[in-house]
């Protein structure tokens, strides 16, 4: 029977999510990839245990995560909970999302309707064997559904006890501001927007979302902080055959030209001067943004989780380092 590491909370740092009372680890684990039914169960279980032993308490899922079919990541995570992690449920923040296509017909496609969101969460809870999730997100803005309906659905989910907090994902600053006004009127515990952000993807800065979120007490949970794995040492010298780009599993390979390799190599030199790997530097860089609560990492094996979680040991940057990084990114 699994017993968690007694010093796990000494290995991680935590931050309040916006102005809420919920503390999240600065590094969280996402289950988008490598937790489907085509993956090895023992490796999945080892990754969850390794993360928890490192003080990672936030586990991020969605109804459509996993392959070969939607929902398999939730099913496998639920099995891990039952097999070994159930004694630690109250020490975990479990989140799931709904918004993308999930089942046939008009009620299971991309939308933010009350029917879809509530039905989807019920299915997710059943797959994971849970009575509630800690955070339930609307996964993507839906222009065809009134925001009032989406907000009211999320509010009623909290009031029904099926979620403790609500969040949104992939909402722009304008969209976030609009729905947050409704949540304030309803007194809904809306605490977080989950968005993509990295050294190579800085749209939230141009959009103003990060400044708005910080000023208005909304946390930001960042996914793809390594830009689909491009911000790692593995691609500097070429494309390994066993990598996601090598297997043709990501569109990001189209951006890996000679100019990008030179940029990655220059960033890797700065990382080395700090005693970090490129991936650790990239994660630390995201976390230096005061609006960011947590970075959500993916992994294919436990060692990757331990390596990337170590980014929290070096979150400070000198002015010279910031200037050098900005110069490289501007090339």
Task: Kindly label every feature range from the protein language model.
Residues 39-46, 69-72, 76, 108-116, ...:
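Alpha-helix N-cap and loop-to-helix initiation/capping positions
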